[in-house]
Swiss-Prot record:
UniProt catalytic activity: dCTP + H2O + H(+) = dUTP + NH4(+)
Active site: E137 (proton donor/acceptor)
Protein name: dCTP deaminase
Family, similarity comment: Belongs to the dCTP deaminase family.
Pfam families associated with the record: DCD
Top EC class for this record: hydrolase
SUPFAM superfamilies (alphabetical): dUTPase-like
Gene3D superfamilies: 2.70.40.10
Summary of the function given for this chain in its UniProt record: Catalyzes the deamination of dCTP to dUTP.
This protein's pathway: Pyrimidine metabolism; dUMP biosynthesis; dUMP from dCTP (dUTP route): step 1/2
An MF annotation (GO) of this entry: nucleotide binding
Residues noted as binding dCTP in the record, renumbered to the chain: R109, S110, S111, L112, A113, R114, D127, T135, L136, E137, Y170, K177, Q181
């Protein structure tokens, strides 16, 4: 069951869903909450490795991923520029905490998509039990560079109540790769292969 704005306000008032900083009333839509862009990004650094082997037997190495992506901080009143065909990771300002019986769904803004900005390449589900800021997977599929500024409304999160709590809340899992993230983290695919 999707939560309406009334449900979202009630869940937040009860402490079942936490969003920090707390969104203003203007950020709460009919069934979602707008989230803002943070100031931290990860970008691919060309020429660091020859390729990324996504599957065994070669397997991906954690050090290769770290070498692939550089970290960029954008200052106050500055913009991060995403050029056509480029991919980058970003992060929300807000930290989101979900209970074991609520999942989140991340959606890009239609107005930004109409200018060529994809906000999540694949990862739109926020698992029950999540606690942290949300990494965004940006891709510019338009013809012009896009200037993205920290603090701008970048996406919306909606919520679904599960019929029962999951037995595997994300933050409680010892193998959760991205729990408590405060900055955009590069892929941790290598930890899948070592498990």
């Amino acid at each position: 069951m999707k939560l309406s704005d009334t449900d979202i306000r009630r869940y937040m008032a009860e402490g079942r869903i936490a969003i920090d900083p707390v969104p203003g009333e203007d950020a709460i839509g009919a069934m979602s909450v707008d989230l803002q862009l943070g100031d931290s990004f990860r970008v691919f650094v060309p020429g660091k490795v020859s390729h990324v082997d996504l599957a065994p037997p070669g397997g991906i190495k954690g050090r290769d991923i770290e070498a692939l992506m550089g970290h960029v901080e954008v200052g106050e009143n500055e913009a991060f520029y995403l050029h056509p065909g480029e991919f980058a990771l970003g992060i929300t300002i807000q930290r989101v905490r979900l209970p074991a019986d609520v999942a989140g769904r991340l959606d890009g803004r239609s107005s930004l998509a109409r200018l060529g900005l994809m906000v999540h390449a694949t990862a739109h589900t926020i698992d029950p039990g999540w606690d942290g800021r949300i990494t965004l997977e940006f891709f510019n599929c338009g013809p012009l560079p896009l200037a993205m500024r920290p603090g701008m409304r970048i996406c919306a999160i909606s919520f679904e109540a599960l019929m029962s709590p999951t037995s595997k809340p994300y933050a409680a899992s010892p193998t959760a790769k991205y729990k408590d993230q405060l900055a955009p983290l590069p892929s941790r695919l290598a930890s899948d292969q070592s498990a």
